[in-house]
Regions:
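Serine-esterase "nucleophile elbow" of acetyl-processing enzymes
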Residues: 1-55, 60, 65-74
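Alpha-helical cap/lid subdomain in secreted, periplasmic
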Residues: 33-45, 61-213
Length: 213
């Protein structure tokens, strides 16, 4: 009689996004910080965290590359963290994404992922400037796109990681000098050391509620 054993398979979580996620997979990035949290909670053997971020990406870029960069890797869960460039690039280069197109592409991505029985988590874009009095030039647009993502999450029954609201709440007390950068970001957008730790904990907390056991 052949003897066998069951080898435990790690559950794979892919983080799908832009330059923030690309950096998140590097040293000190939020994905690496989450690896550390998993190790500290004796769960590292059960989960594989994979970064799939590309600088400059917008929602339609994710849609175009999701087959190769996500579906082909057979993840158990996907965390989508996108939206800053869809807003930011409207102002800087005129190549942002209109709200209706943003919503349509986002829904199409979720549909494809759910067809494969992949758990989908949505993140709101965190910041384009850290000022707390809503004088960052793109606060209005960013809040609008965050609201769209909240609606998409509710409509599709996807867990929401509301980084936009979390950043606003934290910065009220941590950025009393009303600086446009330096508390959680290096430049108002990309995460510094504190920002990577902050995002890692928020994502871990959300995943622990329904996916990480």
């Amino acid at each position: 009689m052949a003897l066998g054993f069951n080898r435990q398979t790690k559950k794979k979580i892919i983080f799908f996004g832009d330059s923030i996620t690309q950096a998140g997979a590097g040293p000190g990035g939020y994905i690496k910080k989450m690896d550390s949290i998993l190790a500290q909670t004796n769960k590292a053997a059960n989960y594989e965290l994979v970064g799939a971020g590309i600088s400059g990406n917008k929602i339609y870029d994710l849609y175009l590359r999701m087959e190769a960069d996500v579906l082909a890797k057979s993840p158990d869960a996907v965390v989508i963290f996108i939206g800053v460039n869809d807003v930011w690039h409207k102002r800087t280069s005129g190549t942002g994404t209109d709200p209706d197109k943003f919503e349509n592409f986002y829904n199409a991505i979720i549909k494809k992922l759910k067809e494969k029985n992949i758990a989908v988590y949505l993140c709101t874009p965190a910041a384009i400037g850290e000022k707390t009095d809503f004088t960052n030039s793109l606060d209005g647009d960013l809040n609008n796109y965050a609201a769209i993502i909240r609606k998409i999450a509710a409509t599709n029954n996807c867990p929401l990681i509301d980084l936009r609201q979390s950043f606003l709440d934290h910065l009220k007390t941590a950025n009393r000098d009303n600086k446009d950068r330096g508390t959680l970001t290096t430049d108002g957008v990309h995460l510094n050391v504190a920002g990577n730790i902050f995002v890692a904990q928020k994502m871990f907390d959300a995943l622990q509620k329904g996916f990480i056991k």
